[in-house]
Amino acid sequence: MLADILIPLIKKNWMAFVYFTPVLFVVLYLLKEWRAAYGFNNLGQTVAAPFGYERKTLPYNKENCARTKFLDGKSLSIKNRDQCGDLYLQRSGTYKEIVLTTPKQLMEYYKSNSKNHSKLDSFGAGAFLVALLGECLGFQNGSEWLSMRKVFDSFFTHKAAVENFPVMIDYISEWIKDLDTEQISDIDPLQLVSDLPFTCIAKYLYGSELCSKQFLQALKDLIPMHTELMHYSFLTVAGRFKIFQYFPSKKMKQVSQFQRQFIDLSLKQVELSRQSGQETVVEKLYRHVESGKFTFNNWIQTIDEILFANIEVTSTVMAWALVEMGSNIEEQNRLRCEILKVKEQSSKDDFNKETDPMQRYMKLTDTYLQYCVWETLRMHPLLWFSFPEISSETLFIDGIRISPNTPIVVDQYQINYNSPIWNPSDKPKDFGKKFAPSRFENITLRDALYSQVTFGAGSRKCLGRNFAELLIKSELAYILSKYKVTLTEKVEFSKDTFVVQPKTKIQLTAL
């Protein structure tokens, strides 16, 4: 019956049909891309219902927050909490996501079967990020993630970080000696410290003795390109669409150029490791490619993730640590007194690298230095809203049933600032918003397990957190032992980055 109608119609208007058909296919393709461009396509199908009640939705912020949660997430968090309460939905592109804001909700989420939790295939960013890092460890889910994570975890344990600590200290102490006094006045703190984590982790991955100055410089020359590509992935609309990968655009050429140069540098270091007989982390990991444990792209893109993507995270926290010292002179002075006492002991004692009091001090977890690092991490999550995850099972959070495959994000501002543990009844109002490292004298990390999520929570915590903490402690210890840190500008948040970076200037004054 339908054919009897369509065939004469097509014969009569065949020219229009010829032109219209490809246009229709293009429109349908673009619609599909638009739906998929923001990750998991939910399109209002999320249903959250209290026990025993008819189906109904949670409070919902209909404004598109896909960019806002990166660029102005703190303001978005405060606004949403005031208007929507503790548990709500927000729009991110073409899908809705559940937002968790309390430690209790976070605990209920992560106490569900974590094997059923997975990241969105584009981290909620878009297809361009998949082209750059789509096969790295952080993008994997299920058995693939478990298999790869087990391998990479063995190289980033606390023990591995401690064993590599002398190499870190050697580089940082030389870096301090080489600081130009003309370059430490009115300087961007991120610019000041950004070289430290990159170089230290590169030396760990590729072997300290095999990392020539030329090789390290070649790696560092790739940083601006990678940073630009990451920002494009998260902060532009075009970066969300898969179709743009098939056009010879400037950005896709940059992706190819970066990957080609990075692969060439890394493979040369693998060959150098084998020729010299010196084992390195990168070479050991490459053996798993040769054995078929994971693919070449899994290997090279995870090294990229560790060295370029995650190092920006570490350098940002290191910059915030200096900003907090400049903002809180009393805390800075207390920390300096602790550091100088240890340094004085180091100058008197007869020691080797393994028994150096300064190195022993930085490994301890019950010092004011450690508390300052934890407080910096608490107050400065790298993202105000976490990357979205989904669960393949039905969840119950705050008595609300959450349908499977619903994107879930964590409001890290509310968790890190407003959790009850940071605001005890015997302290002033909004004590959680104050930089107070001494709070950790009576709080253990276990107590704060679901009240601080800078490095993530659950089984997918940041791979490099052990190295990051030691780097931040070393930075503070060596800088404060020689310099007083002061602010020369008002502290603001950078508006053109996907991680929450400080926008200010500091000055280092020799003691």
Curated annotation (Swiss-Prot):
Its EC number is 1.-.-.-. InterPro entries: Cyt_P450, Cyt_P450_CS, Cyt_P450_E_grp-I, Cyt_P450_sf, Cytochrome_P450_monoxygenase. GO terms for molecular function: heme binding; iron ion binding; monooxygenase activity; oxidoreductase activity, acting on paired donors, with incorporation or reduction of molecular oxygen. It is found in: Membrane. Disruption phenotype: Impairs pulcherrimin production and subsequent red pigmentation. GO terms for cellular component: membrane. Pathway: Siderophore biosynthesis. The chain crosses the membrane at residues 14-34. The keyword Transmembrane applies. It is a single-pass membrane protein. Heme binds at residue 462. GO terms for biological process: secondary metabolite biosynthetic process. Belongs to the cytochrome P450 family. This is Cytochrome P450 monooxygenase PUL2.
